[in-house]
């Protein structure tokens, strides 16, 4: 048996609908499926980019206080074929967005945008 591929990353969210709206508007993710478990007081929504298998799993636990992300988790990354355009779009939508940056001695090739729960997405220029 061998490992085949990455399936999803789970993000716990305070406001499920606001998070879905962010990932749809900011990156074009689409809701793939939703599972509600009222008896266990949580809902899971899987989002995916069209044609991609990797998903973001948004988990909403009913009545939970805002989550503390901590300092161990940094970010998820996504590729862009229009880095400048996406950076401008994210700023125009009012999202917390950094300017385009580069590693020391390198031209700008990435920036960060933050979702409603404080999770950061690194947007990287596609090669």
What are these regions (language model features)?
Residues 73:
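Flexible, small-/acidic-enriched active-site or ligand-binding loops
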Residues 3, 10-53:
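Core segments of cupin and vicinal oxygen chelate
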Residues 2-4, 32-36, 43-46, 78, ...:
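Vicinal oxygen chelate
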Residues 61-64, 127:
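A short, sequence-level motif marking secondary-structure junctions
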Residues 9, 76, 80:
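Hydrophobic adenine-recognition pocket in adenosine-nucleotide-binding enzymes
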């Amino acid at each position: 048996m061998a490992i085949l591929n990455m399936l999803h990353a789970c993000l716990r969210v305070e406001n499920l609908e606001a998070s879905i709206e962010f990932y749809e508007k900011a990156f074009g993710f689409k809701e793939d499926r939703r599972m509600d478990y009222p008896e266990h007081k949580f809902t899971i929504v899987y989002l995916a980019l069209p044609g991609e298998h990797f998903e973001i799993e948004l988990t909403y636990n009913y009545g939970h206080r805002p989550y503390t992300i901590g300092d161990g988790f940094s970010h998820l990354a996504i590729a862009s074929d229009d880095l400048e355009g996406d950076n401008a779009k994210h700023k125009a939508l009012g999202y917390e967005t950094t300017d385009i940056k580069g590693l020391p001695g390198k031209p700008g090739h990435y920036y960060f945008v933050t979702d409603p729960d404080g999770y950061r997405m690194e947007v990287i220029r596609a090669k």
